[in-house]
Amino acid sequence: LDETSRPDVAQWRQKGADSLATGSITRLADGRWDVRFRLWDVVKGQDLGGQGFAVTTGDLRLVAHRIADYIYEKLTGEKGIFSTRIAYVTKAGAHYRLWIADADGENAQSALSSPEPIISPAWAPNGTQLAYVSFESRKPVVYVHDVASGHRRLLANFRGSNSAPAWSPDGRRLAVTLSRDGGSQL
């Protein structure tokens, strides 16, 4: 089945399917790939839409994630996360690394390497910045990392603890926990 054919929904319904994705991938004359898909509601017999993309070989994974996001949103009503990125910290021996990767763990890139702990990575809602806590100064300090440029800026380095960065929903503000005067405060 490709995206131009209407599937036999009765047959798929008998097999217990609720939905069906059909598609095709074709090599174009310029070396790119034409990727197309269509989603079907097998129960109602409805076409739920589809998309087409012309991409390079290097972008095939990204397109697969976009297709998965589209299908997930159509079936659940919630945005998919397949095209998003994750941030995580690893520790090897006495060395810590802050990593940024695709949601499936592929394309991991090291954002920071330190002999001191790195904790609490928190994405800005638009995915362009990442706040985290680093102990490079032998105390917790909050930084914001710009994903595109790789540059970071110091956000909170007050006396006491600076921790738990959390972005506002609009991404314009960042709340942090401080203990400047003995007790923890936001």
Residue ranges and their predicted role:
Residues 37-39, 86, 98-100, 142-144, ...:
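Hydrophobic beta-strand positions in blades of beta-propellers and related beta-sheet-rich domains
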Residues 102-119, 145-163:
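Multi-bladed beta-propeller domains
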Residues 1-34:
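Short, solvent-exposed, polar/charged sequence segments at loop or secondary-structure edges
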Residues 86, 127-131, 171-175:
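Hydrophobic beta-strand positions that form the internal "hydrophobic ladder"
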Residues 80-82, 125-126, 169-170:
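Residue-level detector of Asp-centered blade-edge/turn motifs that repeat once per structural unit
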Residues 79, 90-97, 113-116, 133-142, ...:
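A flexible loop/linker signature enriched in serine peptidases of the S9 family
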Residues 29-30, 43-110:
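C-terminal/domain-edge helix-coil "capping" segments
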